[in-house]
Amino acid sequence: SGNLNRISDMMNEMSEKDKRRLRVVHHDLRAEENDMLAADLGKFNFILHMAASSHVDRSITDPLTFVYDNVVATCNILNFAKKSKNLELFVYFSTDEVFGPAPNKVMYKERDRYNSTNPYSATKAGGEELAVAFENSYQMPIFITHTMNVFGERQHPEKFIPKCIISARDNLSVEIHSNRNKTKAGSRHYIHACDVADGCLFLIKNRNKIVKKIKNDYGGAKCPKFNLVGPVELDNLKLAKLIAKSVGKKLRYKMVDFHSSRPGHDLRYALDGSLMKRLGWKPKVSIEKRIDQVVNWTLKNKRWLKI
């Protein structure tokens, strides 16, 4: 779902020492791997499969592209990974949306039933099932993560937080998706990209201990799953007000009935993060500090709001 300019921009901010640790290999993941790709990549121990098309609106207007990007590409990567003799862990990066809308006070656990309500979440669920099948069929070591609404610096301006930053800066009205009566805003557990990275590193570094600790939790089911959850649940109106406050403006907004304006969208998603907390991980920085961090960076790097 990203822009390759993000990688080059981040590399420009890296030290020469860190740059030497990074190599970019270009390949269309919808195409099967070839000998040249294998030679370029060389030996590897870990794969974090985070590549995906992720915008719900686009998945509704163009579902087949999402099938190619999120299902076919995942199958190709798994096929490539299973040939490695050095693979220690494959992490498939999934989404809270595979569970569908969450009623009030319901927080979905890792092994709860799936209920995809749009093509994006359906293709991510399909990728998950492929990961489970590959672990069962080929004894590949695989973890699956679910995250909720990742945000951060350089986020695509089509997403809610960059839109709010632009609207607050320019004194424009923000659309807040709500229930049919326009009295209650949708809510999420927003999580910063740095916290997601921290959670993934925690899983990688502690993978052997984790497998032993949870092996009896789900009756020995393959592919352990982990919810990486943000610090607090936050409705979108409160989030927009936090952003406007950080920008230094008063929020202008209107509540919009999301049912009629955005088919395939859900008012509330919610994940139970108790498993990761029990294992010893939770986000280290408050949502307020993360919002300030992103707003300040974005206003200083305005070109990212135009990409």
Predicted regions and their residues:
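A short, amphipathic alpha-helix embedded in the catalytic core of nucleotide-handling enzymes
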Residues: I77, F134, F160-A168, G199-L203
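The catalytic Tyr-centered alpha-helix of NAD(P)H-dependent dehydrogenases
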Residues: S116-T123, E153, P157-I161, H189-A193
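Hydrophobic alpha-helix immediately C-terminal to the catalytic Tyr-X-X-X-Lys motif of short-chain
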Residues: G126, L130, F134, C164, ...
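C-terminal substrate-binding subdomain of Rossmann-fold SDR/epimerase-dehydratase oxidoreductases
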Residues: K19-R20, H27, A168-I307
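Short beta-loop-alpha junction of Rossmann-like oxidoreductase domains
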Residues: P101-P103, E153-Q155, K159, L275
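A glycine/serine/threonine-rich, flexible loop-to-helix segment
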Residues: V106, P157-I165, I243
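N-terminal Rossmann-like NAD(P)+-binding domain of SDR-like oxidoreductases, especially those catalyzing
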Residues: S1-V150, Q293, K300
